[in-house]
């Protein structure tokens, strides 16, 4: 049987000093016989998705202790992408993912921790923790803080739902009155929790369910609902249970790398495509797969995107549904249940419940479940009360949304589209691929051509859009915003939202080697690989060049001859030390960001560090 890792610091005569320090944290002789379980929290007063996690950490700690473990809590950093967006702060968001993963490794290995429960929620925190769990491969459970309730506002004598993207969009409308802008600002984000649409945070928390590292309900159960408290308690019990399962019974099936197999990654990607999740999830799944040493790449994603239907449409792809509505329709398990009935899933993947997927769906898919407690959990309803207190209300729907024909979650037969919500495009403009979220795009825009309007920074593009320099039919190209070129691969929510506010979102396209917020909609193509700073063809595009996009055929091409392309490559490389660099951009790059840029690979590799460079150090 494997020994507790923590015994290296709690057993043996030569560890008296370490034990003395452990005692100073409140431990005693009995505790030295138990597993030390880290509560990897991400509480922060900067982020509404994390503002309530201090209480959550205390709740989990108490339950771990009751269940026979020794809880030890520490925090990771957490950046709010919505607050960091629209200025140089967004350069730091993606690089923080690597720092989160590294900091967890440092604390866990320095203190010989036996297991960990990851309390995450927002955009880069869940991926960073997932990378760490797969790197360390100790018993791990994920539990998110839960989604925010959708905002509500009265317009034209009707109550409509709103969210963060509405606040950004309306703020960008030059003809909008200040009073209405303020009203939306006050109502768009009413509670603690991750922003209420199928943005990056909620997408990732749904994917941890599909992978099998979190309990059913994790991705969709509201932060404010009392049922979330039960989920925290159950997660705490689960981490103690699987920790003992591994160390007492040598059951390696409960370890992250056993659970997060290639088949589990495929299930997660299938879910992502079916629900039209954030394009950022692709970046993070590719990065996590490398930590798990799994061969999962853009080709796998492309293959899946061609056969998975789009069966769940949520904001920002529609204003009708938010995460609270997905939950009422059965949550992640409801979506997976429909995919399973169409034989589109790997059914034998395992999870932290020590069940395979098919067994889990029998219990948690509302179409199949006979368990009244589970059906009651999916009736959790928003309260519509402004609060930052977790599990503070217990409202319930009278009925569940079983409508698989016209409801929030649909059967594969009644899908919103037989094409999935995400697609990978290839061509001379993106030799290694690029990503588009098709969930919010009309079929009439699946084939699109137009002249390029080229910008070498997000700021430059935003100014052009707001000044009215972009017209219907244009393709906005924003380059040198990739992992290396930015550096940091900024999100482009402001450019896409401002195109929407200018009524250009359905008649223009945007292409970038940067990335998009989960709140992005419209004809927005990101993750162009190779990026401009890595000698990608996007660096060679000129104003007025025609770009051809064909989503149906999965093609994106710069419409110039091969001879012209080679001539442009020659001209660019003749600039020598100035080649493949933005020439007119004024941007301060800190040493921390330069370090990230030096090691960063393009988006098709998950924007992770180049291990070949590391091996040469």
From Swiss-Prot:
Positions of the catalytic residues: 517
Binding site for Mg(2+): 81, 123-124, 491
Note describing how the cofactor binds: Binds 1 [2Fe-2S] cluster per subunit. This cluster acts as a Lewis acid cofactor.
Catalytic activity: (2R)-2,3-dihydroxy-3-methylbutanoate = 3-methyl-2-oxobutanoate + H2O; (2R,3R)-2,3-dihydroxy-3-methylpentanoate = (S)-3-methyl-2-oxopentanoate + H2O
UniProt enzyme class: lyase
Cofactor field: [2Fe-2S] cluster; Mg(2+)
Binding residues for [2Fe-2S] cluster: 122, 195
Modification N6-carboxylysine occurs at: 124
Pathway note: Amino-acid biosynthesis; L-isoleucine biosynthesis; L-isoleucine from 2-oxobutanoate: step 3/4; Amino-acid biosynthesis; L-valine biosynthesis; L-valine from pyruvate: step 3/4
Keyword line: 2Fe-2S, Amino-acid biosynthesis, Branched-chain amino acid biosynthesis, Iron, Iron-sulfur, Lyase, Magnesium, Metal-binding
EC number(s) reported in the record: 4.2.1.9
An individual GO BP term: L-valine biosynthetic process
GO cellular component terms, semicolon-separated: cytosol
Pfam families from the UniProt entry: ILV_EDD_C, ILVD_EDD_N
A Gene Ontology molecular function term of the record: dihydroxy-acid dehydratase activity
Family classification: Belongs to the IlvD/Edd family.
Functional note: Functions in the biosynthesis of branched-chain amino acids. Catalyzes the dehydration of (2R,3R)-2,3-dihydroxy-3-methylpentanoate (2,3-dihydroxy-3-methylvalerate) into 2-oxo-3-methylpentanoate (2-oxo-3-methylvalerate) and of (2R)-2,3-dihydroxy-3-methylbutanoate (2,3-dihydroxyisovalerate) into 2-oxo-3-methylbutanoate (2-oxoisovalerate), the penultimate precursor to L-isoleucine and L-valine, respectively.
NCBIfam families in UniProt: ilvD, PRK12448.1
Subunit structure: Homodimer.
Name of the molecule in the record: Dihydroxy-acid dehydratase
Organism expressing this protein natively: Buchnera aphidicola subsp. Diuraphis noxia
Gene name for this UniProt entry: ilvD
């Amino acid at each position: 049987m494997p020994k507790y890792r923590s015994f290296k610091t709690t057993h043996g005569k030569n560890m008296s000093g370490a034990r003395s320090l452990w005692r100073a944290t409140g431990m005693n002789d009995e505790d030295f016989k138990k597993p030390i379980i880290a509560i990897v929290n991400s509480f922060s007063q900067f982020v509404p998705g994390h503002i309530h996690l201090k209480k959550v950490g205390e709740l989990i700690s108490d339950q771990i202790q009751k269940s026979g473990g020794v809880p030890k809590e520490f925090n990771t950093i957490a950046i709010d992408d919505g607050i960091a967006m629209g200025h140089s702060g967004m350069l730091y968001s993606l690089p923080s993912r690597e720092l989160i993963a590294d900091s967890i490794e440092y604390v866990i290995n320095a203190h010989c921790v036996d297991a960990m429960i990851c309390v995450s929620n927002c955009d880069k925190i869940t991926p960073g923790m997932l990378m760490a769990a797969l790197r360390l491969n100790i018993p791990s459970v994920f539990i998110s803080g839960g989604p925010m309730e959708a905002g509500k506002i009265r317009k034209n004598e009707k109550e409509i739902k709103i969210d963060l993207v509405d606040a950004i969009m309306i703020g960008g409308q030059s003809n909008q009155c200040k009073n209405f802008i303020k009203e939306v600002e006050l109502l768009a984000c009413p509670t603690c929790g991750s922003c209420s649409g199928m943005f990056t945070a909620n997408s990732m928390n749904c994917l941890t369910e599909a992978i099998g590292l979190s309990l059913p309900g994790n991705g969709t159960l509201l932060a404010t609902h009392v049922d979330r408290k039960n989920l925290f308690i159950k997660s705490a019990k689960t981490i103690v249970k699987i920790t003992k399962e591994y160390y007492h019974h040598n059951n390696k099936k409960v370890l992250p790398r056993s659970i997060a197999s290639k088949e589990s990654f495929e299930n997660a990607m299938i879910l992502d495509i079916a629900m039209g999740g954030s394009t950022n999830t692709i970046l993070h799944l590719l990065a996590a797969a490398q930590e798990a040493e799994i061969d999962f790449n853009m080709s796998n994603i492309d293959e899946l995107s061609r056969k998975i239907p789009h069966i769940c449409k949520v904001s920002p792809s529609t204003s009708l549904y938010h995460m609270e509505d997905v939950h009422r329709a059965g949550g992640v398990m409801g979506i997976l249940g429909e995919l399973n009935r169409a034989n589109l899933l790997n059914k034998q993947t395992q999870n932290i419940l020590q069940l395979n997927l098919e067994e889990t769906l029998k219990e948690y898919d509302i179409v199949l479940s006979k368990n009244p407690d589970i059906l009651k959990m999916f009736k959790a309803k928003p309260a519509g009360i402004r609060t930052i207190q977790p599990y503070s209300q217990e409202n319930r729907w009278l009925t569940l949304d079983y409508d698989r024909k016209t409801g929030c979650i649909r059967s594969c037969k009644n899908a919103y589209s037989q094409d999935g919500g995400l697609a990978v495009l290839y061509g001379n403009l993106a030799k290694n691929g690029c990503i588009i979220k098709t969930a919010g795009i009309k079929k009439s825009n699946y084939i699109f051509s137009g002249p390029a309007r080229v910008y070498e920074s997000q700021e430059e593009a935003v100014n052009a859009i707001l000044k009215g320099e972009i017209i219907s039919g244009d393709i906005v190209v924003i380059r040198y915003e990739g992992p290396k070129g930015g550096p940091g691969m900024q999100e482009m929510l402001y450019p896409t939202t401002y195109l929407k506010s200018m009524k250009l979102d359905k008649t223009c396209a945007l292409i970038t080697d940067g990335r998009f917020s989960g709140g992005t909609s419209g004809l927005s193509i990101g993750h162009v690989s190779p990026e401009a700073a890595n000698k990608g063809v996007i660096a060679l595009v000129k104003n007025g060049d025609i770009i051809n996009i064909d989503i149906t055929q999965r093609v994106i091409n710069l419409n110039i001859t091969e001879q012209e392309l080679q001539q442009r490559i020659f001209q660019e490389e003749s600039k020598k030390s100035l080649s493949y660099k933005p020439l007119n951009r004024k941007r301060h790059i800190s040493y921390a960001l330069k370090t990230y840029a030096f090691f960063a690979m393009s988006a098709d590799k998950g924007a992770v560090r180049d291990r070949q460079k590391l091996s040469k150090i």
